[in-house]
Amino acid sequence: MYFNYFPTTMYDPAGDGSAKMVTNIMKRVRVRTNMKKEIVMMDPYDVKENETPEIISDKHHGSPYYHWVVMLMNDISDVNHDWVKSTRQMQKYLLSKYTETQLTETHHYEIPQTSGDTTTMIEVENTTYPSATAVTNYEYEVALNEEKRSIDLLRNEYLGYFTEEFSDLV
């Protein structure tokens, strides 16, 4: 359904006059920043284990065909790299990137920084802050993956408007 909105063009790769109608996949559209910041238009959502954009779209929008809206609203261009990995996918990824020994090695150090009611962890040099907590490569990669679990879903009352505007922009 995503590419249905894209324009088509005649393309002759061989240059012999036998052009074919193809979808112009080079066309790019981004969601307006102000639209993504409109909290009233979005519902926060935590991706469950093994959920795909299609599954979430089916649950939230009533059809798996709006998976591209889920992805576009969350700046996901490659589901294999930008989407949260399942436990099994994560284990496979970690073992392809690190040896068993490297998984337990220190990636960086962190200290808590508090401002008002909020505490965040910031990366620091261990030599500057001897009380800093070591974060292993495993912990670092798992935390990066977990950050991808929190997404925003476009509320259904705005879906028609969004798809119309997308169609106009493409």
At which residue positions do the language-model features occur?
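Cell-surface/extracellular proteins and modules involved
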Residues: 1-170
